[in-house]
C-alpha cells in the first residue's frame, strides 16, 4: 500500500488535508477534509506541478499526460487530474472520498510531487459553453492548494 498526503494552504483562510492511498495496481482512493469554503460545489483537480512559489497559480495546468480535453471523472476523454467537484456544506466544510484510476501513486504517471487544487467555483465537467470549458471546466480561481507527498 502506497500512501500520500497534501496539506492545503490558502491566502483565503481555506485549510484541509487530502489523503491518497493505492494498493498495487488498484485505483487510487482520495479522502479529504476541507474547511473555510463557501457552500456549494468546488472544482477539485490534480495539477501538473508541485510548485507553490507563486501560491496556487504556479501549480500549472491540470495534470494531463495523455493530452486530452477537460472532462468529468467518468469520461474517457478527460485530463488525468480531472476529479470533478467536492460538495461543501452550509458550515463551509467538505468531507469526501473519491476513487480514481488515472492518478496512480507509483510508476511513470505518478502524481507524487504534483499539486492538488480546490477551485472557487463548480467545475462544469467539460460540458458548459464557456471558452474555458475544455481546458479548466470554468472552475474559477484557485482558493487552496497543496503538494502531494509520500507518506510513511
Curated annotation (Swiss-Prot):
Its main location: cytoplasm. It comes from Capsicum annuum (Capsicum pepper). Its cofactor is Cu cation; Zn(2+). GO terms for molecular function: copper ion binding; superoxide dismutase activity. This is Superoxide dismutase [Cu-Zn]. Homodimer. Keywords: Antioxidant, Copper, Cytoplasm, Disulfide bond, Metal-binding, Oxidoreductase, Zinc. Belongs to the Cu-Zn superoxide dismutase family. The keyword Lipid biosynthesis does not apply. The gene is SODCC. It catalyses: 2 superoxide + 2 H(+) = H2O2 + O2. GO terms for cellular component: cytoplasm. Cu cation binds at residues 45, 47, 62, 119.
Amino acid at each position: 500500500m502506497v500512501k500520500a498526503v497534501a496539506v492545503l494552504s490558502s491566502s483565503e483562510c481555506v485549510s484541509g488535508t487530502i489523503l491518497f492511498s493505492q494498493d498495487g495496481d488498484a485505483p487510487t482512493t482520495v479522502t479529504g477534509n476541507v474547511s473555510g469554503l463557501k457552500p456549494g460545489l468546488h472544482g477539485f483537480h490534480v495539477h501538473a506541478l508541485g510548485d507553490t512559489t507563486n501560491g496556487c497559480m504556479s501549480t500549472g495546468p491540470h495534470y494531463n499526460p495523455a493530452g486530452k480535453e477537460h472532462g468529468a471523472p467518468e469520461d474517457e476523454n478527460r485530463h488525468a487530474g480531472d476529479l470533478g467537484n467536492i460538495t461543501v456544506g452550509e458550515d463551509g466544510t467538505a468531507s469526501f472520498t473519491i476513487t480514481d484510476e488515472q492518478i496512480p501513486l507509483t510508476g511513470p504517471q505518478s502524481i507524487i510531487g504534483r499539486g492538488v487544487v480546490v477551485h472557487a467555483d463548480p467545475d462544469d465537467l467539460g460540458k458548459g459553453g464557456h471558452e474555458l470549458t475544455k481546458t479548466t471546466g470554468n472552475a474559477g480561481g484557485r482558493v487552496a492548494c497543496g503538494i502531494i507527498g509520500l507518506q510513511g
